[in-house]
């Protein structure tokens, strides 16, 4: 729960001086990106902005405290303040913030600005006490906020110092409105107004001016002088002389003498006890101070001018002026040291009664009460964990003695899940092993099963599927039906293990079961994970259309539950990119891969390896080797600076080896082949992929025999495990092996198998990347006119893609080529004596590329009858009677010119 007072603008108090000159300056705040109010404590920053905000509706207010350095807490309150300003317009951001479903503050702010694009009237967001922020991530995120905020939004920041928000740049661009301590200092006229409404007997204007000068217009000093003058008989000027030259850091003695020593003992204790509360209401005051009429007491303290201010329009929430509050907390530690733990315990109990466990934990920690802290955690820790209050939980668990954790194994489990969420896998097992060693009878029963479920998740994350399977099965055997979270975890792990082992049908069933349980219990990240796994399994089985439909369900879940910022979102858009690439929808595949990189923009660059490999695949399919090389440089740098799952390494190696194949870089392939891992098995798609990489490198090096052994074994495994997409890929690589080895009939046989299987998978780009060798074989098959209709159509589509994205074959017959051809000593005499026109050379190139008459007409944008005329003329000039003879003639010319066809 969010504390309402932190989101409430302070109420404009009676007897305050209206700062007309400053309000006039602030009236143009909507013309600036940032309004910055800076001064030391006590200059009236908050009072000024509360006066300016009075009557404004489209304004959000966020009062900071020390706890707001936690990113998740900062995000929750800031978005809540924006919701306040827009009357609930930013619903998606609110859900994302509440459920912690965002990758970073910047990505959350980006979503906020998308929602605000539809809001056209002026908006204001006030952040008070920004000097309390010390987290550099928040500073950087707020710089992003200011750079990208909509033109109609003005950020108003109140701070005791100059915040790290790129102020200089804003100042240069005239996007900054500044009010500093010199402007905030009271003028003589404002000081006179102040004393006139605070003192029963007015003072002369000259006296008021002298007092104002003595304290340099410092508002807090003027307030202290007025308070002292009311409580004592000495003059205001005498108090002013005492305060002259004193600043906020030297006020303690003065406040003791002039404030605390001039109130009765009951009021003194009330001030000291209540000061431990960052915000307070009637119930908190009753419990912490023991006074029955807390609201009345707070209003009385406010009337006495003891630096207490209302935090909301209802008047229910109060807080002390920061300067006075800090002073009181320090005095409380000195004067009430013995009582302080009990005071904090009372505060914790009251916060708990009002439903604010995080505030209660703050006081339980301050009280040093391990038992209270334990009880709060036992009741609320998992809720805080699910809301990503990880820093607070970690601090709390560290404060508990080990014996307390052993007495409450669920807290050990919580600590282990915290470690798991931070990828500290080794520490998880160490912690659980130690707990099991020391807790009696823990090695059986429900808690042991929950330990095993977590251990199983750690094992699969750490690349140990056999151990993960053993632990997941043990957990499922021992977990009661009602322990849904651990059952979801164990079922998901078991499904992933079966996926790794190639048992795709069983794995798919378990992932569908995981999805059903996760949806039933609102465990959305596991629901998303299970859908992603289902899609991968269906892709491996060759059911790409069903995989697509499963991905659509996952995208729908992301939209409904606002999971866009989860790292798993990148996984989904990446496998969508892989599917689009397979279908030769390269522009969409590239856009999807880039969106995956955007999701991971706040993470380490190593996390982007997979999407980067996908971008390289797109470049390779287009034949854009320059771009591929540039991206490969970055990929190889990432490979050398990180530790990756075998699946990631396999995908990275794939694009490297294909690039070497396309560029004929045998040295790089040979060096890689000497050092790359040779997996023991090939029973899943990523192990198949790595062995395929090895075979491709061997083919490039002319090592046909070992490559054939590898590919035949891969095919045997793929057929037995029904890894149909891998079988399709393997057949294509085997085709290249046979073609290069001169075994043309074998090459044609496996190519026909690959084309037939592609009717199921829909593969296009897997054929395209094999380039001219594939194009030549497809041209021959098309000319034979013996392919079934579906295979014929696919072959023509693949050929068009090769011609579009790779070097156009008719480009061999451009003007430069024709000139060199005609000057070649071996050119046929018929070509010399009856030269073709440039258009006829282009038509010959397209015939050689396998284009039909209609396709040639479309390519050259002329009528089909015109193409027939060109074909008749070139046949006559070449001395050929039919299309196949023209193809053979073109092939001879290309070979003569040194082209490897």
UniProtKB/Swiss-Prot annotation:
<dbReference type="GO" id="GO:0045893">
    <property type="term" value="P:positive regulation of DNA-templated transcription"/>
</dbReference>
<dbReference type="InterPro" id="IPR000792">
    <property type="entry name" value="Tscrpt_reg_LuxR_C"/>
</dbReference>
<feature type="domain" description="HTH luxR-type">
    <location>
        <begin position="829"/>
        <end position="894"/>
    </location>
</feature>
<dbReference type="InterPro" id="IPR027417">
    <property type="entry name" value="P-loop_NTPase"/>
</dbReference>
<comment type="subunit">
    <text>Monomer in solution. Oligomerizes to an active state in the presence of the positive effectors ATP and maltotriose.</text>
</comment>
<keyword id="KW-0805">Transcription regulation</keyword>
<dbReference type="Pfam" id="PF17874">
    <property type="entry name" value="TPR_MalT"/>
</dbReference>
<dbReference type="GO" id="GO:0045913">
    <property type="term" value="P:positive regulation of carbohydrate metabolic process"/>
</dbReference>
<protein>
    <recommendedName>
        <fullName>HTH-type transcriptional regulator MalT</fullName>
    </recommendedName>
</protein>
<keyword id="KW-0547">Nucleotide-binding</keyword>
<dbReference type="InterPro" id="IPR023768">
    <property type="entry name" value="Tscrpt_reg_HTH_MalT"/>
</dbReference>
<dbReference type="InterPro" id="IPR016032">
    <property type="entry name" value="Sig_transdc_resp-reg_C-effctor"/>
</dbReference>
<dbReference type="GO" id="GO:0005524">
    <property type="term" value="F:ATP binding"/>
</dbReference>
<dbReference type="Pfam" id="PF00196">
    <property type="entry name" value="GerE"/>
</dbReference>
<keyword id="KW-0238">DNA-binding</keyword>
<keyword id="KW-0067">ATP-binding</keyword>
<dbReference type="GO" id="GO:0003700">
    <property type="term" value="F:DNA-binding transcription factor activity"/>
</dbReference>
<dbReference type="InterPro" id="IPR011990">
    <property type="entry name" value="TPR-like_helical_dom_sf"/>
</dbReference>
<keyword id="KW-0804">Transcription</keyword>
<dbReference type="InterPro" id="IPR041617">
    <property type="entry name" value="TPR_MalT"/>
</dbReference>
<feature type="binding site">
    <location>
        <begin position="39"/>
        <end position="46"/>
    </location>
    <ligand>
        <name>ATP</name>
    </ligand>
</feature>
<dbReference type="InterPro" id="IPR036388">
    <property type="entry name" value="WH-like_DNA-bd_sf"/>
</dbReference>
<comment type="function">
    <text>Positively regulates the transcription of the maltose regulon whose gene products are responsible for uptake and catabolism of malto-oligosaccharides. Specifically binds to the promoter region of its target genes, recognizing a short DNA motif called the MalT box.</text>
</comment>
<feature type="DNA-binding region" description="H-T-H motif">
    <location>
        <begin position="853"/>
        <end position="872"/>
    </location>
</feature>
<keyword id="KW-0119">Carbohydrate metabolism</keyword>
<keyword id="KW-0010">Activator</keyword>
<comment type="similarity">
    <text>Belongs to the MalT family.</text>
</comment>
<dbReference type="GO" id="GO:0003677">
    <property type="term" value="F:DNA binding"/>
</dbReference>
């Amino acid at each position: 729960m969010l504390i309402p007072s932190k989101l409430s603008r302070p109420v404009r108090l009676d007897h305050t001086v209206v700062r007309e000159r400053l309000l006039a300056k602030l009236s143009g705040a909507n013309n600036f990106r940032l309004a910055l109010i800076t001064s030391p404590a006590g200059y009236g920053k908050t009072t000024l902005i509360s006066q300016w905000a009075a009557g404004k509706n489209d304004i959000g207010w966020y009062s900071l405290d020390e706890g707001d350095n936690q990113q998740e807490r900062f995000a929750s309150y800031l978005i809540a303040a924006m919701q306040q300003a827009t009357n609930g317009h930013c619903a998606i951001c609110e859900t994302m913030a509440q459920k912690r479903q965002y990758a970073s503050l910047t990505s959350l702010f980006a979503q906020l600005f998308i929602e605000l694009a539809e809001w056209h009237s002026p908006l204001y967001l006030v952040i008070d006490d920004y000097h309390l922020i010390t987290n550099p991530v928040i500073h950087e995120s707020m710089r992003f906020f200011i750079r990208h905020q909509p033109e109609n939004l003005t950020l108003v920041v109140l701070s005791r110092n100059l915040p790290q928000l790129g102020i200089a740049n804003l100042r240069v661009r005239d996007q900054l409105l500044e009010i500093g301590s010199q402007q905030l200092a009271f003028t003589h006229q404002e000081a006179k107004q102040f004393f006139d409404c605070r003192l029963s007997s007015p003072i002369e204007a000259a006296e008021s001016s002298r007092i104002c000068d003595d304290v340099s217009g410092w508002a807090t000093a003027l307030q202290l002088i007025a308070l002292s003058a009311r409580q004592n008989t000495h003059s205001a000027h005498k108090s002013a002389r005492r305060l002259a030259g004193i600043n906020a850091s030297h006020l303690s003695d003065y406040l003791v003498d002039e404030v605390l020593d001039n109130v009765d003992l009951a009021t003194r204790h009330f001030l000291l006890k209540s000061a431990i509360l960052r915000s307070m209401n009637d119930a908190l005051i009753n419990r912490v101070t023991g006074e029955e009429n807390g609201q009345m007491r707070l209003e009385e303290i406010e009337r006495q001018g003891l630096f207490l201010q209302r935090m909301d329009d209802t008047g229910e929430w109060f807080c002390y002026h920061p300067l006075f509050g800090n002073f009181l907390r320090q005095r409380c530690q000195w004067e009430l040291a013995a009582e302080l733990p009990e005071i904090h315990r009372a505060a914790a109990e009251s916060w708990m009664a009002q439903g604010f466990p995080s505030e209660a934990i703050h006081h339980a920690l301050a009280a040093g009460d391990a038992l209270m802290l334990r009880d709060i955690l036992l009741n609320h820790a998992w809720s805080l964990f699910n809301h990503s209050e990880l820093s607070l939980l970690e601090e709390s668990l560290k404060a508990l003695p080990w014996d307390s954790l052993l007495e409450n194994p669920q807290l050990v489990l919580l600590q282990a899940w915290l470690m798991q969420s931070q990828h500290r896998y080794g520490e998880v097992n160490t912690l659980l092993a130690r707990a099991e060693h020391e807790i009696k009878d823990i090695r059986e029963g429900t808690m042991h099963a929950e330990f095993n479920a977590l251990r199983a998740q750690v094992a699969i994350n750490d690349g140990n599927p056999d151990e993960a399977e053993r632990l997941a099965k043990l957990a499922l055997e021992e977990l009661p039906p009602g322990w849904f979270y651990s059952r979801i975890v164990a079922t998901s792990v078991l499904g992933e293990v079966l996926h790794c082992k190639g048992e795709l049908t069983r794995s798919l069933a378990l992932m569908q079961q995981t999805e059903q349980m996760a949806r039933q219990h609102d465990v959305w990240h596991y629901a998303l994970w299970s859908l992603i796994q289902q899609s991968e399994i269906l892709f491996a089985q060759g059911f790409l259309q069903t995989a697509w439909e499963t991905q659509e369900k996952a995208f729908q879940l992301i939209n409904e539950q606002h999971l866009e910022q989860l790292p798993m979102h990148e996984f989904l858009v990446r496998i969508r990119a892989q599917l689009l690439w397979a279908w030769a929808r390269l522009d969409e595949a590239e856009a999807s891969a880039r969106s995956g990189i955007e999701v991971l923009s706040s993470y380490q660059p190593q996390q982007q390896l997979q999407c980067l490999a996908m971008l390289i695949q797109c470049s390779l399919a287009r034949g854009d080797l320059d771009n591929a090389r540039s991206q490969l440089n970055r990929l190889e740098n990432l490979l050398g600076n990180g530790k990756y799952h075998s699946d990631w390494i396999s995908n990275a190696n794939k694009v490297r080896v294909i690039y070497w194949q396309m560029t004929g870089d045998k040295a790089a392939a040979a060096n890689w082949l000497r050092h790359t891992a040779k997996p023991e098995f090939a029973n899943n798609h990523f192990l198949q992929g790595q062995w395929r990489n090895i075979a491709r490198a061997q083919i490039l090096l002319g090592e046909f025999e070992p490559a054939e052994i590898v590919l035949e074994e891969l095919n045997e495994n793929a057929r037995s495990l029904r890894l149909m997409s891998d079988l399709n890929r393997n057949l294509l690589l085997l085709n290249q092996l046979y073609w290069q080895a001169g075994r043309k009939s074998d090459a044609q046989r496996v190519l026909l198998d690959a084309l037939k299987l592609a009717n199921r998978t829909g593969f296009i780009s897997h054929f395209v990347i094999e380039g001219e060798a594939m194009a030549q074989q497809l041209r021959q098959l098309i000319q034979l006119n013996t392919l079934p209709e579906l295979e014929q159509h696919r072959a023509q589509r693949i050929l068009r893609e090769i011609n579009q994205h790779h070097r156009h074959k008719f480009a061999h017959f451009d003007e430069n080529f024709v000139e060199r051809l005609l000057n070649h000593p071996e050119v046929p005499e018929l070509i010399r004596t009856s030269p073709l026109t440039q258009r006829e050379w282009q038509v010959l190139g397209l015939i050689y590329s396998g284009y039909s008459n209609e396709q040639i007409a479309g390519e050259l944008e002329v009528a089909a009858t015109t193409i027939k005329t060109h074909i008749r003329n070139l046949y006559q000039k070449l001395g050929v009677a039919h299309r196949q003879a023209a193809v053979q003639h073109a092939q001879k010319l290309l070979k003569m010119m040194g082209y490897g066809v």
